[in-house]
């Protein structure tokens, strides 16, 4: 089954509520009442106002070659008033250096820095079935931070704050937007996509962009094949208080027989938990009293799991060979923190799955973010892939305008698809393969992955290559 799914991936890759409107403009105002039909024409409509969709709207609005385009951002949720609370949210993202660069170029990063974030300067990943580990140190690899931990709602607030600034005059936002359906153009030369709303409003656009998540209605309207499956695992998240105050700039991940458990630093005393485990175990974790939950979590981080004597002997021998060549043998390691308590009501669970749209584009349509691809959170790459989509799509649209072409010109949309699939697909395959490799506990498999981990940890160029791909 595992081999079949991996082969399938490779083969396919080869071949009614009230609506509130905010107008981010001094000249383009729009009525959005429930009385009768109102048809508005836009150059670009973005379906989905999450982190990726809002960032794309901001990127288009701030690009000098694209700022003349009339853009509509449709968000299904009502407009939320953000307030920075003393306690951290339980949903966070690990932003890469490339994502930071994108946010800085759009003047979004300053809003995040003025609120709060936590840099990750070290990362340690180790196997509970063999104790083989790999560690990354920002000073040794990139001379910069490995990642930045930011709360989802804070990031979205920062993007919206910049998006609604007076600098951006060509973007309209409709909150509480309930879309009833799409009529998509069949040909590039006559791109005229229709978006129908539940309240009777109708919008048309040259370019429709689906940023509407893993269950994308835009992707469904395109009629493209979407390869997807569930992992029969759930992710359990929570906000944790550490037993001792530390610098806390290390991200920890331990591979258990049931899946990875990870701690992401928030500040000197708190960390965010992402624990991937079986559905049955996850449901039990969510129901446990707080003290029992903390005990089980500390066991997951510290407990000694049974090791195969043959695997231990082979990894010890291989470690001594590495040491004889002056390479690190993996014996030196940091110890993870102990957990003191869990923030009340911070525990939550969500399903885990894989998704790959075989096409990111159609005439006058493009997909970004989870609408195009979905990955397991074990490598923290999901949202970074989406922000990479934003960067590339904005650049290709600007290039098309610079060349005197329409933003729906097929060759330029094709360039976007090719560029992103060349980056996203290998990442998706690698993450899926890692998940499958580490959820098998047979001694021969444990031995192979342990030796591979030891070798990778010993070879700095390979570690640099891994980090280079992860941050682009």
Give the label of every model feature segment:
Residues 332-334, 395-472:
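C-terminal helical "tail/cap" subdomain of flavin- and related membrane-associated enzymes
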Residues 103, 201-202, 207-332, 336, ...:
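Conserved FAD-binding catalytic core of PHBH/FMO-like flavoproteins
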Residues 1-40:
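N-terminal mitochondrial targeting presequence
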Residues 85-128:
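N-terminal FAD cofactor-binding segment of flavoenzymes
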Residues 349-367, 425-426, 442-446:
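FAD-binding beta-loop-beta segment adjacent to the flavin cofactor pocket
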Residues 45-47, 61-91:
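Glycine-rich FAD pyrophosphate-binding loop
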Residues 34-52, 72:
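Beta1/beta-strand and adjacent pyrophosphate-binding region of the FAD-binding site
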Residues 115-221, 227-239:
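Conserved N-terminal helical subregion
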């Amino acid at each position: 089954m595992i081999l079949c799914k991996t082969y399938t991936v490779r083969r396919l890759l080869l071949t009614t509520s009230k609506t509130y409107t905010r107008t981010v403009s001094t000249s383009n105002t729009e009525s959005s009442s429930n009385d009768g039909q109102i048809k508005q024409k836009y150059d670009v409509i973005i379906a989905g106002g999450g982190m990726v969709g809002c960032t794309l709207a901001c990127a288009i609005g701030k690009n000098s070659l694209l700022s003349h385009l009339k853009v509509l951002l449709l968000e299904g949720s009502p407009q939320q008033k953000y307030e920075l609370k003393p306690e951290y949210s339980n949903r966070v993202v690990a932003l890469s250096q490339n994502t930071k660069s994108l946010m800085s170029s759009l003047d979004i990063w300053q809003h995040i820095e003025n609120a709060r974030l936590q840099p990750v300067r070290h990362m340690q990943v180790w196997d509970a079935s063999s104790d083989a580990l790999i560690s990354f140190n920002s000073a040794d690899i990139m001379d910069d931070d490995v990642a930045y931990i930011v709360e989802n709602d804070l990031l979205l607030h920062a993007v919206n704050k910049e998006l609604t600034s007076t600098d951006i005059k060509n973007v309209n936002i409709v909150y509480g937007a309930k879309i009833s359906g799409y009529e998509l153009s069949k040909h590039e030369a006559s791109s005229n996509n229709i978006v129908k709303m539940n309240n009777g409003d109708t919008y048309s656009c040259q370019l429709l962009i689906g940023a509407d998540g893993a269950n994308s209605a835009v992707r469904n309207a395109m009629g493209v094949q979407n390869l997807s499956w569930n992992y029969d695992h759930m992710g359990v998240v929570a906000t944790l208080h550490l037993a001792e105050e530390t610098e806390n700039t290390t991200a920890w991940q331990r591979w258990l027989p049931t899946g990875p458990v990870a701690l992401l630093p928030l500040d000197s005393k708190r960390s965010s938990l992402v624990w991937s485990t079986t559905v049955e175990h996850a449901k039990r974790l969510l129901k446990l009293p707080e003290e029992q939950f903390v005990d089980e979590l500390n066991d997951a981080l510290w407990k000694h799991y049974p090791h195969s004597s043959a695997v231990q002997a082979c990894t010890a021998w291989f470690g001594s060979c590495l040491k004889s060549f002056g390479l690190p043998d993996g014996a030196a390691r940091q110890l993870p923190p102990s957990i003191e308590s869990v923030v009340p009501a911070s525990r939550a669970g969500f399903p885990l799955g894989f998704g790959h749209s075989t096409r990111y584009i159609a005439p006058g349509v493009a997909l970004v973010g989870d609408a195009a691809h979905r990955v397991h959170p074990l490598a923290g790459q999901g949202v970074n892939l989406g922000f990479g989509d934003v960067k590339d799509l904005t650049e290709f649209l600007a290039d098309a305008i610079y060349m005197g072409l329409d933003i729906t010109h097929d060759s330029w949309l094709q360039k976007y698809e090719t560029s992103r699939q060349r980056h996203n697909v290998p990442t998706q395959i690698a993450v899926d393969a890692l998940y499958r490799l580490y959820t098998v506990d047979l001694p021969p498999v444990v031995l192979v992955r342990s030796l591979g981990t030891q070798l990778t940890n010993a070879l700095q160029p390979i570690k640099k290559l891994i980090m280079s791909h992860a941050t682009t």
